[in-house]
Amino acid sequence: MNHLDKNAKKSLGQNFLRDKNIINKIVNVFNIENEKVLEIGPGQGDLTKELLKKAKKVLAFEIDKSLIEHLKNEIKDLHFELRDQDFLNVNLNDDEFKDYYVVANIPYYITSDILLKIYRSFWNFKGIVLMVQKEVAQRIVAQKNSKNYSKLSISSQYLADVKIEFIVNKNSFIPAPKVDSAVISLKFKDNIDKENLEKMLKFFLVCFANRRKKLTFTLNRNFNSTKVKLAYEKLNLSDNARIQELDVSQIVLLFTYLN
């Protein structure tokens, strides 16, 4: 254990991945040979170094000054670019991010923020491989009628083909987090309506606002009740239906009929 391990900052969600086997598996989820890779929170550079063996460029975002200093000293590869910048403040719509893969062991406390940030510029990215909490991974891939089914499930599955690649034991990290993790992959779909993306994401949020109540309760407060009734008839939905009983395709159709 080095001084950076000992001084890992809980406030930044720092858990350094040291398991070489897991790192190699992450690097090989997608074929990143000669591809551009964006890394969020490179930490001490263990994953970064392996990515650089395959990728033609690795662009990393880090905000911890001590880690930035370490990375500058540790990695001299010309294909590596390190930015002292909060990823959540980056404009991902910029053309410079076109055709990147995102591969990262991210700070868990901002997982949803990171995902939604990428989702809002999904067309620039070829795919995502992220280390997340196991519980979050289960929410992302959850199907209807599951207790884990949520707006994150719908948003993720609407935009991408999602998969839990493998589970990672908490002891693969220094310091070890309290829970196990999972590596997820997302490959974005080609047929997504970019123009209505914000409206769609907001609709998912609205639908899950009162998940214990009938969905009509929420919809009638946000849409014309006649439109809601007609949409239900077209989809052959019961008035008693709750959001967790509808799959992604039904929710997307519901959005279409209401708009």
Swiss-Prot record:
InterPro entries per the UniProt record, alphabetical: KsgA/Erm, rRNA_Ade_diMease-like_C, rRNA_Ade_Mease_Trfase_CS, rRNA_Ade_methylase_Trfase_N, rRNA_adenine_dimethylase, SAM-dependent_MTases_sf
GO-annotated cellular components: cytosol
Binding residue positions for S-adenosyl-L-methionine: 15, 17, 41, 62, 86, 105
Main location: cytoplasm
EC number in record: 2.1.1.182
Catalytic activity: adenosine(1518)/adenosine(1519) in 16S rRNA + 4 S-adenosyl-L-methionine = N(6)-dimethyladenosine(1518)/N(6)-dimethyladenosine(1519) in 16S rRNA + 4 S-adenosyl-L-homocysteine + 4 H(+)
Gene Ontology terms, MF aspect: 16S rRNA (adenine(1518)-N(6)/adenine(1519)-N(6))-dimethyltransferase activity; RNA binding
SMART domains in the record: rADc
Top-rank taxon: Bacteria
Compartment(s): Cytoplasm
Keywords for the protein's UniProt record, in alphabetical order: Cytoplasm, Methyltransferase, RNA-binding, rRNA processing, S-adenosyl-L-methionine, Transferase
Family: Belongs to the class I-like SAM-binding methyltransferase superfamily. rRNA adenine N(6)-methyltransferase family. RsmA subfamily.
Its job: Specifically dimethylates two adjacent adenosines (A1518 and A1519) in the loop of a conserved hairpin near the 3'-end of 16S rRNA in the 30S particle. May play a critical role in biogenesis of 30S subunits.
Name used for this protein in its record: Ribosomal RNA small subunit methyltransferase A
Lineage of the organism: Bacteria, Bacillati, Mycoplasmatota, Mycoplasmoidales, Metamycoplasmataceae
Protein's gene: rsmA
